[in-house]
Amino acid sequence: MNVGIKGFGAYAPEKIIDNAYFEQFLDTSDEWISKMTGIKERHWADDDQDTSDLAYEASVKAIADAGIQPEDIDMIIVATATGDMPFPTVANMLQERLGTGKVASMDQLAACSGFMYSMITAKQYVQSGDYHNILVVGADKLSKITDLTDRSTAVLFGDGAGAVIIGEVSEGRGIISYEMGSDGTGGKHLYLDKDTGKLKMNGREVFKFAVRIMGDASTRVVEKANLTSDDIDLFIPHQANIRIMESARERLGISKDKMSVSVNKYGNTSAASIPLSIDQELKNGKLKDDDTIVLVGFGGGLTWGAMTIKWGK
């Protein structure tokens, strides 16, 4: 059985926050932010818009793109670190709001690696033969856990969502190879402070980890698929920081024109990062049927996940 993406959708809130916004209250500048991160702007959800709302918008698009009905979905997995509340989960909320029927629904927390973790998890369920259309969503409202007094992190994060339907696809298409992993010894470098409820990060340590793991994990899944870097049509890394992305690209041996860059428009959107990049490349025609692509993410935990896919239904 070939398992892959049968439907796709993405959503970013309408409100756009440019770098000039932060110049009003932080010792920073548009020039510095752009140079150090690659970010020019990010989308933030309104106060009355929560993670489940973002996830819903992306899910509706993915269901329509797959040509199925909500009742055809037999499982929902949502990757998020910013659920509306601890429980019910965002997946529970989607199950009710979409009208899927009383299917299994769960949130999966692997921070910025969450979308990769959830796609890999969904693949196993479909491969078992017991499930046929699994809705996987990566959605985060990072603006609600961003410390706007912290110059090192305040400028980095945005909000958004992406969704896919994982199921059986045509011969020769779908997920080819994958890996996921974690290193809990690095958990102290990127975490949600239990007292303030805000995100804290040791940027230097996270940078070193990210450059190494994104490049190495990508290389391993390419080799596992019996491919070389020359076979890759598009490299879609987690959009955390342009310098991390460029270093990972060089480590993998991919030319600059083959790397997706959307961090300039969205900032770091955690679990939504990779699907928002996919959305951009589909719309601009850079991602086409039968393209071989590499997806890779890293996040708090510390965690990582990577996969190669032959794109198409």
UniProtKB/Swiss-Prot annotation:
The gene is fabH. One of its GO terms (molecular function) is beta-ketoacyl-acyl-carrier-protein synthase III activity. SUPFAM superfamilies: Thiolase-like. Residues 239-243 are annotated as: ACP-binding. GO terms for biological process: fatty acid biosynthetic process. Pathway: Lipid metabolism; fatty acid biosynthesis. It is an enzyme of class 2 (transferase). Belongs to the thiolase-like superfamily. FabH family. PANTHER family: 3-OXOACYL-[ACYL-CARRIER-PROTEIN] SYNTHASE, BETA-KETOACYL-[ACYL-CARRIER-PROTEIN] SYNTHASE III, CHLOROPLASTIC. This is Beta-ketoacyl-[acyl-carrier-protein] synthase III. It comes from the Bacteria. One of its GO terms (cellular component) is cytoplasm. HAMAP family: FabH. The last Arg residue of the ACP-binding site is essential for the weak association between ACP/AcpP and FabH. Catalyzes the condensation reaction of fatty acid synthesis by the addition to an acyl acceptor of two carbons from malonyl-ACP. Catalyzes the first condensation reaction which initiates fatty acid synthesis and may therefore play a role in governing the total rate of fatty acid production. Possesses both acetoacetyl-ACP synthase and acetyl transacylase activities. Its substrate specificity determines the biosynthesis of branched-chain and/or straight-chain of fatty acids. It is found in: Cytoplasm. NCBIfam families: fabH, PRK09352.1. The active site is at C112, H238, N268. It comes from Staphylococcus aureus (strain MRSA252).
